[in-house]
């Protein structure tokens, strides 16, 4: 009976018209985004063969989230998020066109790649914040947890499929083919956003406050909440110590495993397979109870999987480590996202969820720079082992508080 109820929660989530259209449009955007990301990563490695440059490019993609996500969240709480995400999506299409065109005419260099990466990195805080605010408007509250997990499953299933497709495209059409694919996928997503029909939210209260004051409100809200504060700290350490290893995979493929674009695609796909399985598990189980415990398990598992990955030079064991990193990171991040969404007042959701974006999308930039710097001195494997051990050590400070954290979210959440 339990399994039937959990499967029913997935069907109910997909029965909502706007949610189904929204996810159907995001799917090709996610898919071709991963295709382009593999192409850009391999292009950066071909241009420089430098782990430090890989860290710089990864940081350029993610660092704007650190600065802009809080402002994007506050802005999203002041406006209708649907026109905002449409504008952001159109801009992403333009960036993909520029990547393709400049590669075709031979004007692409590491500096140009860096500039275009920074450009699109500045767009994604607004796109992601608007997306986070739109999801609750497309779904009934009782179907929200599986809806969040399904959105994550879409993202990570494409993380498995996208690199595999990129591995086929690059030998045939070079990296330019990956950029062209993203033009098409992003355009399809834009069309789906134009088909959404959502009631504009009431933003009258938010517009009366200073933008920076609203950002400060969200930070104070999260700091006072007995559950949000430690959960966000866990997310921070995972995002700095473990998640950046995914951005260093081109270096592991070429330097540690003595491979090329094929091995890079295998590793990226393995991370995606693990993450997809984790997301479908969260969607299948449904409900809020037990998500705090799953968050802790995911955090610990990601650190152990990272240690297993950096400890080997055998590609097959490395692929298992990649899958473990993807699985455990995703059950942690998806559970964290669902807990935060359901524990936060509607008027604060855009700003509070922007903190999630700052940490999970932005903090890996700092981690990538750190790993890149340590790697230039001691090698990728030692750098990866060091940050994984730091991640696991921090967990020991949070475990004694697990029961109190769970109570603040699940019994039901207490709001400050």
Regions found by a protein language model. Give the residues of each.
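Flexible cytoplasmic inter-helical loops of multi-pass small-molecule transporters
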Residues: 2-3, 143, 194-220, 408-414
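Helix-loop boundary and gating motifs at the non-cytosolic
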Residues: 5-63, 220-271
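C-terminal transmembrane bundle of multi-pass solute transporters/carriers
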Residues: 57, 67-71, 78, 82-94, ...
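Hydrophobic alpha-helical transmembrane segments
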Residues: 110-117, 121, 146-202, 245, ...
């Amino acid at each position: 009976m339990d399994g039937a109820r959990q499967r029913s929660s997935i069907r109910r989530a997909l029965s909502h018209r706007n949610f189904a259209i929204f996810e159907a449009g995001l799917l090709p955007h996610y898919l071709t985004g991963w295709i382009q990301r593999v192409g850009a990563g391999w292009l950066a490695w071909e241009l420089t063969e430098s782990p430090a440059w890989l860290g710089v490019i990864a940081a350029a993609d993610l660092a704007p989230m650190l600065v802009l996500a809080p402002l994007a969240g506050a802005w999203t709480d002041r406006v209708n998020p649907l026109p905002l995400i449409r504008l952001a999506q159109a801009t992403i299409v333009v960036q993909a066109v520029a990547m393709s065109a400049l590669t075709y005419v031979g004007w692409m260099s590491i500096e140009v790649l860096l500039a275009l990466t920074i450009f699109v990195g500045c767009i994604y805080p607004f796109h992601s914040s608007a997306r986070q605010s739109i999801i609750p408007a497309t779904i009934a509250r009782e179907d929200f947890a599986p809806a969040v997990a399904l959105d994550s499953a879409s993202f990570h299933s494409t993380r498995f499929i996208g690199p595999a497709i990129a591995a086929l495209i690059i030998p045939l059409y070079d990296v330019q083919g990956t950029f062209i694919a993203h033009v098409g996928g992003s355009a399809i997503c834009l069309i789906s956003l134009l088909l959404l029909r959502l009631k504009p939210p009431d933003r009258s209260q938010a517009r009366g406050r200073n933008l920076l004051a609203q950002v400060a409100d969200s930070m104070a809200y999260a700091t006072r909440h007995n559950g949000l504060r430690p959960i966000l700290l866990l997310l921070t350490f995972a995002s700095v110590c473990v998640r950046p290893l995914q951005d260093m995979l081109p270096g592991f493929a070429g330097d540690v495993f003595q491979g090329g674009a094929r091995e890079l695609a295998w590793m990226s796909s393995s991370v995606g397979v693990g993450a997809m399985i984790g997301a479908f598990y969260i969607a299948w189980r449904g409900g809020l109870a037990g998500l705090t415990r799953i968050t802790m398990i995911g955090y610990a598992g990601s650190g152990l999987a990272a240690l297993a990955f950096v400890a080997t030079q055998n590609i097959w064991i490395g692929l298992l480590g990649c899958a473990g990193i993807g699985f455990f990171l995703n059950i942690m991040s998806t559970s964290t996202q669902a807990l935060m969404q359901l524990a936060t007042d509607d008027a604060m959701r855009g700003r509070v969820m922007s903190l999630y974006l700052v940490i999970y999308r932005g903090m890996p930039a700092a981690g990538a720079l750190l790993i890149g710097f340590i790697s230039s001195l001691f090698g990728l494997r030692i750098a990866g082992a060091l940050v994984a051990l730091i991640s696991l050590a921090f967990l020991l400070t949070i475990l004694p508080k697990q029961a109190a954290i769970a109570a603040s979210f699940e019994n039901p959440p207490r709001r400050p």
